[in-house]
Amino acid sequence: TYIEQFATLAVEEMYRSGVPASITLAQGLLESGYGLSELAVKGNNHFGIKCHNNWKGGRMYYDDDRKGECFRKYPSPEQSYRDHSDFLRYRDRYKFLFDYKVTDYKSWAHGLKKAGYATDPAYPKKLINLIETYELYEYDRKPASFAKSDRKAKRNHEKPARKVKEEKVKVEKTADPVAEPEPELPKSPNEIEQVEALTNEQRQDFQFS
C-alpha cells in the first residue's frame, strides 16, 4: 500500500525537518491520489508542489486552478518527499507551523490551510480524516531507529528469495547422474605387492569365516 511504501520516508523526514510523519503521509495520499495521479506517476510529485520562481529542476505542465500550470518534476519519490519538507521548513509563511508539537496533527492540518498550501476550504478536514482513518498519528511517535530498522527488514526480506533460487540451482545440478570414479591403479611394484597381499588376506577371511 501507499502507506507501507512511504512511511519510512515520512518518519525520516520528520526527524530531519520537524514535519510530522502523519501530515506528510496524509498530504501524500491526498495530493497524489494514493500515488496514482499523473503528477505522481510521471513526475514523482507526490505533494502537488508548483514550480514557483526559484525552481531550477524538471517541470510538468498540468491543469489545476488554472490551465497549464507548472509543477515540479523529480527523479524519484524520495526527492519529492525531501523537497516537501524543505518547502515547508524554509518558507516564511509556514514557519509558525513548527511552533506546534509534532504530535499535534490537527493544528498542522489547519495551519497548512491558513498558510495557503491549498485553496480547498475542506483541506484540513480531509487531512485529519485520513490521519485518523489510517491511524497515521502512530508514525509521529516512532523512534528515529524505526526508519533504519524498517529499511533493514525490507533488505532482509529480499535475501531469502535469492537464497532459495541458489539452492534450487544446486539441487538441479546434483540431480544429474554422476559417474563413479574409476579405481586408482598402483604406480609402483611395492604398491602392487601390497595390493596382492591384501587380496590374499581378504580371500582367506572369506574362506574360513
Model-derived segments and spans:
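LysM (lysin motif) carbohydrate-binding repeats in extracellular/periplasmic proteins that recognize
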Residues: S209
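Catalytic cores of secreted/periplasmic lytic hydrolases that degrade extracellular macromolecules
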Residues: T1-L198, Q202
